[in-house]
């Protein structure tokens, strides 16, 4: 699986996930800096107030 891993509005970058990892995620929240977006491999548990979208295809988490 390949997932995007750039932060917020940085230029697009992606990486290959470890063998057996078939999910990508996109996590979004707000703080004093504004809206923060984090992307990567897997499907993490998030705190309340954090939007999480997980998906299972190549580069699906932009």
From Swiss-Prot:
InterPro entries: Snake_3FTx, Snake_toxin-like_sf, Snake_toxin_con_site, Toxin_cobra-type. Its main location: secreted. It is found in: Secreted. Residues 1-22 are annotated as: Disordered. It comes from the Eukaryota. GO terms for cellular component: extracellular region. PROSITE patterns: SNAKE_TOXIN (PS00272). GO terms for molecular function: acetylcholine receptor inhibitor activity; ion channel regulator activity; toxin activity. Residues 1-16 have a biased composition (Polar residues). Disulfide bonds join 3-24, 17-41, 43-54, 55-60. Expressed by the venom gland. Keywords: Acetylcholine receptor inhibiting toxin, Disulfide bond, Ion channel impairing toxin, Neurotoxin, Postsynaptic neurotoxin, Secreted, Toxin. CDD domains: TFP_snake_toxin. Belongs to the three-finger toxin family. Short-chain subfamily. Type I alpha-neurotoxin sub-subfamily. Binds to muscle nicotinic acetylcholine receptor (nAChR) and inhibit acetylcholine from binding to the receptor, thereby impairing neuromuscular transmission. This is Short neurotoxin C.
